[in-house]
């Protein structure tokens, strides 16, 4: 059986000198005994996996409402499947670059915990509703979840994750990215990779994006050139082949460009990598241009598609009604949320409660507090 010190020694012997080592962790906010058989980052990862917030990601929107499209929503990606895909990419690239795989996957598993129901539409609604109370941001909410809202241990609030993991969440918000660990930078890059590839795939699967529209996209045209003989119209088999090729292409570019950037930077330690003024986990210049145009394409043809915009309208109606109902009648809140209101104030407690809901639970709660014949609006 390997002890924690054995695992730490293995890291030191096999990882590159600029990787973040578990034995060099900056510790936790609340001192506690470390595991005898797990590294500090393995312990972080396991704590995140067992949270309620992580389980709820299964029923939260990525792009398509989790309960929409006549039952076909089961085939589209959710926040959970997106998170697992980011984890896989981050771990794979970390392995190839000699970075700390466990820290990278822990940050990846944690980075989307703060998303509310209804995806980015829900985030915009909550941010507007909380305008006078500090706003709402899913990255900030993820940190709030792991430091305060998940109550699983008697000796401290939250999960008491290492400061290294928590800093990875800060850096996912892009503030001061030059001072992030390479593992945190990697998760940020893997997130962009995953949602670009997978949103294109889901857009095609749903029919909201057509192959004809994709001909406008430089990324797609170059992808087709890499898979000669692709038929038109696309079959489901060919779509899967193209998706697999796109993922592999993006991962190879990220790995190779990052390795080159690290070598050219001359960094020799994790501290030097954090202090380096430029992002070292990066894509080639050509790929950055392709991804930038892909983001513009997705905004125009998928995220602003009228069927997706209908979800935005639904999110606004449901979340606004819930927020006003809870703030007008705090007795509607469950006991745990009511208790938080004493410390963080009613608006923030209401926001925390709503942000933790799944799509389905938000819809069911909305229906319960606005039954047929009841008033459809609550006091502002």
UniProtKB/Swiss-Prot annotation:
Residues 79-196 form the HD domain. InterPro entries: dGTPase, dGTPase-like, dNTPase_2, HD/PDEase_dom, HD_domain, PHydrolase_assoc_dom. It comes from the Bacteria. Keywords: Hydrolase. SUPFAM superfamilies: HD-domain/PDEase-like. GO terms for biological process: dGTP catabolic process. One of its GO terms (molecular function) is dGTPase activity. SMART domains: HDc (SM00471). Belongs to the dGTPase family. Type 2 subfamily. This is Deoxyguanosinetriphosphate triphosphohydrolase-like protein.
